[in-house]
């Protein structure tokens, strides 16, 4: 007997629909240095710039001074969702002139501002107080000013430095110059000065007191280059550094850890010798960075006069291991950050700017004879020094006073960072050079300037936890200045996509994702299936994929997040297993043509064996297995009917005509 098979199947056809021919490259877009925008000005009423700050979530703001009815007051422009908002006045209840404003930022749009203002007179001289005000998360106006320090004397060269954590705590360090005192004057021109610190716990300010180690000796006359600096971690711990002379008259750099509302002991942070020979020149321009675990990195400038063991002025760095290390009780020892500086004793070295990422890698930027020098390092030590980017360019005022331009640099937590310094465009017009370093080692640079142009004044940089940075500065001559800002924009941060695990029916394919962190919202999301874009509702964080777009098999799902500037991040592919077809049935001749073999399988969700039912057409039935053998007793025409079901419930029926001769 020879069996011939007429295959007639009553199973649903799976139709594959043509998708849009849209190719996507699964890569993270680079950050963009956006054009500068003028926040306010040019105006004769703008009389000072106080800095910029950016929180980990990408919100932030800048602060500056503007005269109202002839009196200088504090103004802030907030940065929210990738846009600068109209400036608002901070000191609305104060009638006296403000000075020395500084700003800090925390998540949710929270801002803290401090400034100095007169409140009384003594011996016909003004007595200033240091005030602070807070704009709460989601707020639109600053609260009433509170006293940080009720008496900072005349507020001359207070030079506050404010650091704020993502959790809303802040520290401020500032100087108070006394006219009278019993301190020993070590050098002509020295002053009687206190370096003070205050802590903000999120609700109120607490004065921690004076950090100087020797109140009985004089300090160098206050300048921007010898101003104290402070850094803070998310838990409220931090560090303060300052310049203070020793009894022999040489000014060194000192440091103290901060533990919330308490001060730790004083630690020397600068070198007293080099190559076994003493260093007898002043150290100045301290810069400090601090990590979550409590590691601190201090950089400073060391002068070198005649007889110095140094070949010329140099930048030194010193490491304070984190609080979890046994060696975290003292600095490791100051070392020269960059020995390749030309010019000998006459080299022009600018103040350093240093920062750390969460991997405890450092980046230091400074001006070496007009060239931007970048020093990098890891927990194993300094790893390289190089020059890249437009040159430093002095303003006319800096040239007249033989001042070297300052740089400012911040690192992103995962590596890379943003740096800025005064420079000039190809035509010689003043501009700010911006450098973006990426974690993979790539670099981009650019020049930014306000629309009205003019000389570059004070300059500041802030950074988020998302790879973004803010650059802000005062531009223009006194009496016609502007406040200018620019953003170094990063694509949306990587985010989590949730795809159901295991085999699914097409109707069960629901894709969910968490919102991507970005400073440039609102974001739009697009689901990408096997490289093809699917229509995704605006504002959605989930999508039920149309079953018609899903054939049986393994698919790749990604989600594309795009910010307001068109920068996008595409997630890594996630596997989506779809089973929309019943098990496969095979019927073949067997037993020399006198019988058939029926086999059933399912390579996707698996076969429900107990649901398998076979009718051989001659009255014989079987089930509950994956393979069946049957011999027909006599010639004839028979219809084999096989009913199957998989573990998802996909059912199928196969009918085949079998002829036996």
Provide a role label for each language-model segment.
Residues 31-495:
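Extracellular, repeat-based ectodomains that mediate carbohydrate processing or recognition
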Residues 542-548, 627-631:
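Exposed aromatic-hydrophobic patches
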Residues 521-527, 607-612:
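Short flexible loop/turn segments that cap and initiate beta-strands
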Residues 533-540, 619-625:
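Short beta-strand segments within Ig-like beta-sandwich modules, predominantly Fibronectin type-III
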Residues 491-492, 500-514, 555-558, 564-661:
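Extracellular/lumenal mature domains of secreted and surface-exposed proteins
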């Amino acid at each position: 007997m020879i069996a011939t098979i007429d295959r007639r199947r009553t199973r649903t056809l799976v139709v594959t629909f043509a998708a849009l021919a849209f190719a996507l490259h699964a890569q993270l877009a680079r950050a963009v240095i956006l054009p500068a925008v003028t926040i306010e000005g040019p105006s004769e009423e703008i009389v000072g710039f106080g800095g910029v700050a950016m929180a980990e979530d990408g919100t932030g703001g800048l602060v500056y001074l503007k005269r109202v009815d002839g009196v200088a007051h504090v103004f802030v422009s907030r940065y929210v969702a990738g846009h600068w908002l109209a400036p608002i006045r901070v000191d609305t209840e104060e009638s006296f002139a403000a000075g020395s404003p500084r700003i800090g930022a925390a998540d949710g749009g929270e801002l803290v501002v401090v400034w100095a203002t007169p409140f009384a007179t003594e011996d016909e001289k003004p007595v200033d107080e240091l005030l602070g005000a807070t704009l709460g998360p989601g707020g639109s106006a600053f609260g009433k000013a509170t006293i940080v320090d009720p008496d900072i004397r005349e507020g001359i060269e207070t030079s506050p430095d404010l650091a704020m954590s993502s959790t809303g705590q802040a520290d401020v360090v500032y100087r108070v110059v006394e006219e009278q005192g019993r301190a020993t004057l070590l050098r002509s021109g020295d002053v009687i000065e206190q370096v003070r610190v205050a802590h903000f716990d999120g609700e109120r300010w607490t004065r921690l007191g004076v950090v100087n180690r020797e109140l009985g000796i004089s300090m160098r006359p206050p300048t921007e280059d010898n101003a104290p600096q402070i850094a803070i971690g998310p838990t409220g711990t931090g560090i303060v550094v300052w310049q203070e002379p020793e009894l022999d008259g040489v000014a060194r750099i000192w440091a103290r850890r901060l533990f919330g509302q308490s001060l730790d002991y004083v630690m020397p942070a600068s070198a007293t010798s080099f190559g076994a020979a003493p260093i007898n020149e002043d150290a100045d321009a301290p810069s400090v960075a601090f990590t979550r675990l409590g590691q601190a990195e201090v950089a400073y400038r060391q002068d070198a006069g005649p007889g110095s063991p140094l070949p010329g002025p140099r930048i030194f760095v010193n490491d304070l291991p984190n609080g979890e290390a046994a060696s975290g009780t003292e600095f490791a020892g100051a070392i020269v950050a960059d020995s390749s500086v030309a010019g000998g004793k006459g080299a022009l070295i600018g103040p350093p700017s240093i920062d750390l990422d969460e991997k405890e890698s450092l980046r230091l930027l400074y001006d070496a004879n007009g060239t931007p020098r970048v020093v990098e390092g890891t927990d194993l030590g300094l790893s390289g020094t190089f020059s890249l980017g437009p040159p430093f360019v002095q303003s006319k005022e800096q040239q007249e006073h033989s001042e070297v331009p300052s740089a400012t640099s911040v690192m992103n937590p995962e590596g890379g960072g943003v740096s800025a310094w005064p420079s000039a465009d190809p035509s010689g017009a003043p501009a700010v050079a911006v450098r973006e370093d990426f974690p993979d080692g790539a670099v981009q640079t650019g020049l930014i300037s306000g629309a009205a142009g003019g000389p570059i004044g004070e300059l500041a940089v802030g950074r988020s936890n998302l790879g973004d940075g803010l650059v802000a500065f005062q531009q223009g001559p006194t009496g016609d200045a502007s406040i200018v800002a620019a953003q170094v924009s990063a694509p949306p941060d990587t985010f989590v996509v949730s795809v159901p695990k295991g085999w699914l029916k097409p109707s069960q394919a629901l894709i969910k994702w968490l919102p991507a962190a970005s400073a440039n919202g609102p974001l739009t999301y697009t689901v990408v299936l096997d490289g093809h874009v699917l229509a995704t509702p605006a504002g959605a964080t989930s999508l039920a994929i149309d079953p018609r777009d899903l054939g049986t098999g393994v698919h790749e799902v990604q989600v594309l997040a795009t910010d307001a500037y068109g920068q996008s991040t595409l997630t890594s592919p996630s596997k989506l297993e779809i089973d929309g077809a019943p098990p496969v049935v095979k019927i073949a001749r067997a037993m020399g043509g006198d019988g058939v073999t029926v086999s059933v399988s399912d390579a996707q969700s698996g076969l429900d064996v107990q649901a398998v039912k076979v009718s051989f057409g001659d009255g014989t039935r079987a089930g509950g297995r994956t393979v069946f053998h049957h011999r027909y007793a006599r010639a004839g025409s028979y219809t084999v009917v096989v009913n199957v079901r998989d573990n998802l419930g996909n059912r199928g029926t196969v009918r085949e005509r079998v002829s036996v001769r």
